[in-house]
Amino acid sequence: MARRTDRAPLLDWAEGPGVSPAPETEQGERWAQGYGAAWERRPAGELTPLPQLEDDHIAAVFVVTFDPRSGNIVEWCRPHDIDLEGVEFKSMASGSHRVQSDFIYFRKGGFFGLACFANMPVESELERGARMKSVGVLSPSYTLLYRYMHFLENQVRHQLEIPGHYTPLEAFYEDKKGVLPVGPQTCQPALHWLPPVHKHLYPEMKITHPAGCMSQFIKFFGEQIFVLWKFALLRKRILIFSPPPVGVVCYRVYCCCCLANVTLPGIGATAPESKPFFYVNVADIQTLDGEGSYVACTTEKIFEQKQDLYDVYVDNQNVKTHREHLQPLLRVNSADKEKYQRLNDQRQLLMYSQEVDGDCGSCEEDLFILFFMEQNNRIFQTLLEVASSQDKTLTAEHARSMGLDPHGDRTFLMDLLEVYGFDLMLVIDNPCCP
């Protein structure tokens, strides 16, 4: 069994823009080690620790407040000269005034952000009876943002109770900051890191990551997971709508991205890159309009009317598409039901193993990611084998061997061949024809 790490499952399989390696200390050791190593499983079953990536750093820290006169504003940030335009709306989702607290993942150019929001009743008439703030960070990579969750939750409460006291945030930034290269920022900034200082000035951070988010995702969508799986694998533009709180919906974005994991080399070279955008608002319309593939969530209902921005719209548990040729993919077929049953069987077996054997070395997140990764690899391995054969013909038997319904998944298979550039002939009898 692979050793568990404290790395978050939150999109741990993908990195954001590249990060420069950490400089070595005088003792020749990497600083900020001790977060636990990731592990790689070799074909023979041997576990080998992966190189420790030094990406536990930030590009900015900020405080956003709601001003009754001016609306959302950035009241404080470090560094002073970083472009935070739009962050005041990304870190305080539309409709947040209806909830007491929330957290939000988002993208800002080539950076990823995490912000914690809180809403506190006050007696001040100037503040109209409520004080609302968000405290957040930007990073070139989203894989370790979860580490800051507990700290940001504490700091937003601190800012509500003692506005204007930024000393812990100053110390946090000095410890975690990266230095942007001189010159115009590109969409993929490379950061160069400074050694940490002032660790004693801010509270120790608890490891907080979305444990259980996969289980909630499965329970929420049920068999429709396999509808989302097909759309994710086809690199469609998926937009998830939900009223606040939006944090749990950001995790649904993550789960959707995990559905499309493929580890076979050479797969996906012709397919558009699938990008997690997490929370988006109307200010992101122009950006989304230029994207060929993404998964995002929003609290703004107006997006539903802008059908040119998305292929798939998810409202609560209602998955729908206005694209006529994608309509057949909305139906859950017999093969989907079988896969869903197999997934649940594996979950039950895992829970039994944890209860009886005390197996704490595996978790449901690992099982979920591995289940879909193996399913996807199974499909593409079959397609690669057929592509290397002489007749290059994909039959109903091939479809069954891939865990697909030859007739119910015909449209899905045809689209899959086109998206991933497989020049194969699909020979599956149409059940509607004699």
UniProtKB/Swiss-Prot annotation:
Residues 1-29 are annotated as: Disordered. Residues 1-168 form the uDENN domain. One of its GO terms (molecular function) is guanyl-nucleotide exchange factor activity. It comes from the Eukaryota. Keywords: Guanine-nucleotide releasing factor. Disulfide bonds: none annotated. GO terms for cellular component: cytoplasm. Transmembrane segments: none annotated. PROSITE patterns: DENN. Residues 343-434 form the dDENN domain. Residues 194-341 form the cDENN domain. It holds the Pfam family DENND11. InterPro entries: DENND11/AVL9_GEFs (IPR051731), LCHN/Anr2 (IPR018626), Tripartite_DENN (IPR037516). Belongs to the DENND11 family. PANTHER family: DENN DOMAIN-CONTAINING PROTEIN 11, LATE SECRETORY PATHWAY PROTEIN AVL9-RELATED. Probable guanine nucleotide exchange factor (GEF). May promote the exchange of GDP to GTP, converting inactive GDP-bound small GTPases into their active GTP-bound form. This is DENN domain-containing protein 11. It comes from Xenopus laevis. The gene is dennd11.
